[in-house]
Regions:
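Mature extracytoplasmic/periplasmic domains
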Residues: 112, 284-295, 312, 327-408
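Extracytoplasmic/periplasmic substrate-binding proteins
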Residues: 42, 97, 104, 208, ...
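Short, solvent-exposed loop/beta-turn-alpha elements that line the ligand-binding surface or hinge
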Residues: 116-130, 172-173, 217-240, 293-299, ...
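Hinge/lid segment of periplasmic solute-binding proteins
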Residues: 100-154, 181, 301-309
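Helix-loop-helix "hinge/cap" segment bordering the ligand-binding cleft or interdomain interface
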Residues: 62, 66-70, 137-206, 217-260, ...
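Conserved N-terminal structural module of periplasmic/extracytoplasmic solute-binding proteins
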Residues: 32-111, 121-123, 169, 298, ...
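Short helix-initiation/N-cap motifs at beta->coil->alpha
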Residues: 73-82, 174-179, 258-271
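C-terminal capping/gating helix-and-loop segments adjacent to ligand/active sites or protein-protein/ligand interfaces
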Residues: 138, 147, 323, 366-371, ...
Length: 444
């Protein structure tokens, strides 16, 4: 019996040794061959943003030897339909991917991984974490993405063109509504459009001017009520804004090429072709325009200026401006490499990455930064941005994130009227408001 016990113990030790060897073999095999994580991203033609993503890839791979990351760049308009189809099919999707408010339905569908753990949230701005903390499957509240890009809705202008037209910008960068109408008139009379806006491949470019006019007139809190359906579109203040906006349209503020012009083309229309005085767009303008001219960037001698949006008479939104979190990173909930994919996302949660993003792109970020340590070749722009926005009261909603505050059906009506019908003179101001109010009551 004693020999039997010794033999049993020996076999148990041998068994554990075999198990240990197997585990080590699997670990060594994984380290040797590793995993190639797939990452799909927007920003196909934005080299400065790519530099940041490649730095994240480099840091992740250095920290996780044997594992690699392959980034495939798309234009988001092409990426999201493919991504939706892959998630619906349950195969063919990446481990990590670009995410933003264009596709809010991805969260309740369960396609994004819960980021409650695994991310160094202490290195992310609290407002950025709060922005993507939303109801998921079954109403579960969790953060679902890291807000890499934060962008405000700005109004850029051609300094040289303004000088040639005799337009003097007020010290605070704010024209009154009547002064702004004069500015628009001078641009049009000189043979160029007032606004370099192209709507052929995006659902929001023509929303900037009317949305900012509404903000200036009624203020951020009332705008939120309006987009949530809690305030009537027949409110006299809203009617005033729409009628004023239609006056600008009737003057010829938009280019006749607006409906056939893409977002990328509208950038070139502004800074290279110089066929428009102003460009209402988010502050990610720099991502497309601060690249070499041969890659679509603005000419080296182009004189870029920044305005604040005009103020309507008796406006309640003085110094207010929209800001929102946009280009973000999410992890596929159904991915086979969830832990490693989460580590890719976690690599973004670092002030050094925040500094790199701010310095290379000139765009705000949801990642915490150490401002004195930001090294940037576009410091002149960063200084101008802060000068123009020195008195700005930021409103945590933006033209592109109205979609998160509107019911889907209401958003469709909003886009069809403001991005298509009204700027193309297919519908009048009062008729537009009738349709918006009818939709508000129907989808309330």
């Amino acid at each position: 019996m004693h020999e039997d016990r010794k033999e049993g113990a020996m076999w148990r030790r041998t068994g554990w040794l075999v198990v240990t060897v197997c585990v080590l073999s699997v670990a060594l095999n994984s380290a040797a061959y590793g995993v190639d994580l797939k990452w799909w991203s927007h920003w196909a033609i934005e080299d400065n943003k790519k530099l940041v993503l490649f730095e994240v890839k480099k840091r992740f791979e250095a920290k996780h030897p044997g594992n690699t990351v392959t980034i495939t760049f798309y234009e988001k308009a092409n990426m999201f339909p493919v991504l939706r189809a892959a998630f619906t099919a349950g195969s063919g999707f990446p481990d990590v991917f670009y995410y933003e408010a264009d596709v809010p339905e991805f969260i309740p569908a369960g396609w994004l991984a819960d980021m409650s753990t695994g991310i160094r949230w202490e290195n992310i701005e609290p407002s950025a974490k709060a922005f993507w903390t939303r109801p998921g499957p079954g109403g579960k509240m969790a953060p679902w993405a890291i807000a890499v890009e934060s962008a405000s809705d700005e109004l850029y202008y051609n300094k040289k063109m303004f000088q040639q037209l005799g337009i003097t910008v007020p010290a605070n960068g704010v024209f009154t509504a009547e002064q702004f109408k004069d500015v628009v008139g001078k641009c049009i009379k000189s043979g160029v459009a007032a606004f370099a806006t192209g709507t052929s491949d995006r659902e929001y470019p023509a929303l900037y001017i009317p949305s900012e006019l509404l903000l200036g007139k009624i203020g951020g809190d009332e705008v939120k009520k309006l987009v949530r359906g809690e305030l009537s579109w027949k409110d006299p203040r809203v009617v005033e804004v729409f009628r004023y906006y239609r006056e600008l349209i009737d003057m010829g503020a938009y280019s006749k090429a607006m409906t056939s012009m893409t977002l990328a083309e509208s950038h070139r229309y502004f800074h290279t072709d110089q066929k428009a005085c102003m460009f209402p767009v988010s502050s990610w303008y720099t991502g497309r325009s601060f690249v070499p001219p041969e890659k679509g960037g603005q000419p080296k001698d182009f004189e870029l200026g920044m305005l604040n949006y005009p103020m309507m008479k008796d406006g309640k939104g003085a110094n207010q401006k929209y800001i929102g979190y946009q280009g973000s990173l999410a992890v596929a909930a159904m991915g086979p490499n969830l832990a490693l994919a989460m580590e890719v996302a976690n690599t973004f949660a670092d002030p050094e990455i925040g500094n790199l993003w701010a310095g290379k792109t000139g765009i705000q970020t949801g990642i915490k930064t150490d401002v004195p340590k930001i090294d940037s070749p576009i410091k002149w722009y960063i200084d101008m941005f802060h000068q123009v926005n020195r008195n700005t009261k930021w409103q945590d909603i933006a033209v592109q994130t109205f979609k998160l505050n509107m019911k889907p059906e209401m958003w469709e009506v909003w886009v069809s009227i403001l991005n298509q019908g009204l700027p193309n003179k297919l519908i009048g101001a009062d008729e537009a408001l009738d349709k918006l109010e009818a939709a508000r009551l129907k989808f309330k």
